[in-house]
Amino acid sequence: MKTAFSLETVNTRYQEPNRNRVESKYYWEELFQLVGAGGFHAVELPYDPGFMGARCCFPFSKVVMDVKFGGVEGFKKVLADAKIDKIAGIFASPRAAGSVEQYVEGFKRSVKGMLGLAGELGCDYVTVSASPEYCTMGALLDKKAELLDALAAALGELADEAGDIKLCVRNEFWGILRGAGMHDFMAKVDKRVGYCVDLAHIKIAGEDPAEFIRKAGDRVGVVILTDTCFEDKDEVWKGPAPAFPRTGATQVFKDLGQGSVDLCAVFAALKEVGFDGWATVDNRQTRQVSRGILRARYALNAVEG
């Protein structure tokens, strides 16, 4: 099993004191050094081709890599200087509205763009969210079965274009593929498409991550090592901004090792199914990125012995 560190750990979408520092190139250059020093020699990138254009240094699109880092090779050199020798994968949560046809066509365009960039970056995997957030679906909820059938067919087409890149579907607790519902959907999808198993999302949806992995079996394509203590007693998943509940606990995700996900059981299940792909740490909503890197390394060392 190989480990990577996701740059989604950095808060780029919500305001906080001194948030603008993350728009500076020096911030990312130092972050890469910290990631490498923490023993992570591969990273995962969020993909957002239009976010902020080239006005900041979030390395999440080809445009920013070209303008701020001198292209893909220039970006990879910055990583290499920090002892990061691999971009393991990229991910996105394509969002669209309108009819089933409009949603699926928008989804396909987004994934094709991801696959193109992943090829340039030398990624091993691309992960996508096939389901929109429940609260944004509107009229699509009445056509759920039609939408899922169309998405399953689209993923089969995209698998043809993926080539050696492993295309995986992410599970999210706020989508219509939450929890065990993912298995029914994946049964319809081309076997070349794998599961992207996000531990915290599975647990919040009321499932046991280790059992989920066993049921997915050899179709586990990538594992996202997330943690949580959150219990969705108020069905936050159905409302707006489910990652930021309006009542009760306001931090849904925890740094790896700080929540209630049983990592030992997860790693045992991964061994049972013969998983040898990427396990990517994502400390989303961390209160301090540098501390989160060390917490994750400590948690992995404890599990791996």
Q: For the regions a protein language model found, what residue spans apply to each?
A:
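Catalytic-face loop-and-helix region of soluble metabolic enzyme cores
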Residues: 226-228, 264, 271
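Short acidic/polar active-site loop segments enriched in Thr and Asp
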Residues: 41, 85, 124, 221, ...
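Active-site acidic/histidine proton-transfer and metal-coordination neighborhood
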Residues: 74, 78-82, 86, 95-194, ...
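A cross-domain feature marking catalytic cores of carbohydrate-active enzymes
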Residues: 5-9, 45-49, 88-93, 128-132, ...
